[in-house]
Amino acid sequence: MLERLSGQTRLTALLAAPARHSLSPKMHNAAYAKLGLDYAYLAFEVDNSGLAAAVQGMRALGICGANVSMPNKQAIVPLLDELSPAAALAGAVNTVVNTDGKGHLVGHITDGTGAIRSLAEEGVAIKDQIITIAGAGGAGTAIAVQLGLDGAKEIRLFNRKTATFKQAKQVLKGINAKTSALASLQDLADDRAFRRSIAESSIYIDATGVGMKPLEEHSLITDPALIRPDLVVFDLVYHPAETKLLAFAREHGAKKVMNGLGMLLYQGAEAFKLMTGEDMPVAYIRELLCRDKE
């Protein structure tokens, strides 16, 4: 990487805590090298206490873009100059672009577009469909927003009654006001409503994190009757590559089972495009990530 750095090198970054585990530096720097772009991507350990200073640093240093992850996705919103329509609806940001290089910072959310591009890659259409999502955290609500913007018929979100539940209610109000979709939020503890919703949906998305460590032996769906030959099951977890849910859905004849690797790649590709104006070489990056996991 050092031989690529110059006095003209443009800096992109990750603002997160923790940041060390992220695959984003590997993805973006590999893409820069592949395309011969004079950019470098660094991960910075930044939590809410240092976020305002980090954003000022972006302006002062002319950092051309940054990815934003936990715990900063919502906290960064009031620090920016402008939001994309999806970010405004979601009330959260995962990508910031310094649009003029002079400090005008625009926030975007690419989780939803990443998920929908991943579905499209597998031939799964979302227009006019009923979709159930378990988990109303940042990823779940971002996907709900993009589903609404892209023409889903109904979006049924389920979550435990925590602080996240209250926040998600506000997001869904925006979806109902700004899109043609009918968005609803119900308690994940209401098993009857959850089962009925899955039975009426063509796509089930699990955005809870159940299935990754330390919950790798768990699944929200354990009844074979909920798995139908016309149901797509999409788990946002990508490590392990096949969660308990996906193995169960495959075994019992789901139409299609998908993990979160495609979403990871495509949300990164959307951010890459926003920050550089270039298309990320997705096939190359996918191969690189899969090879590293072997």
From Swiss-Prot:
What are the UniProt keywords, alphabetically?
Amino-acid biosynthesis, Aromatic amino acid biosynthesis, NADP, Oxidoreductase
Residues bound to shikimate are 22-24, 69, 94, 111, 238
Q: Which residues bind NADP(+)?
A: 135-139, 236, 260
Q: What is its EC number?
A: 1.1.1.25
Functional pathway:
Metabolic intermediate biosynthesis; chorismate biosynthesis; chorismate from D-erythrose 4-phosphate and phosphoenolpyruvate: step 4/7
Reactions performed catalytically: shikimate + NADP(+) = 3-dehydroshikimate + NADPH + H(+)
Q: Does the keyword Oxidoreductase apply?
A: yes
* Any one GO biological process: shikimate metabolic process
Q: Which residues form the active site?
A: 73 (proton acceptor)
Tell me the GO molecular function terms: shikimate 3-dehydrogenase (NADP+) activity
Q: What protein family does this chain belong to?
A: Belongs to the shikimate dehydrogenase family.
Assembly and oligomerization: Homodimer.
Q: What does this protein do?
A: Involved in the biosynthesis of the chorismate, which leads to the biosynthesis of aromatic amino acids. Catalyzes the reversible NADPH linked reduction of 3-dehydroshikimate (DHSA) to yield shikimate (SA).
For this protein, the record's NCBIfam families field holds: PRK00258.3-3 (NF001319)
Q: Which PANTHER family match?
A: BIFUNCTIONAL 3-DEHYDROQUINATE DEHYDRATASE_SHIKIMATE DEHYDROGENASE, CHLOROPLASTIC (PTHR21089:SF1), SHIKIMATE DEHYDROGENASE (PTHR21089)
Q: What is this protein called?
A: Shikimate dehydrogenase (NADP(+))
Native organism is Streptococcus equi subsp. zooepidemicus (strain H70)
Q: What is the lineage of its organism?
A: Bacteria, Bacillati, Bacillota, Bacilli, Lactobacillales
Source gene?
A: aroE
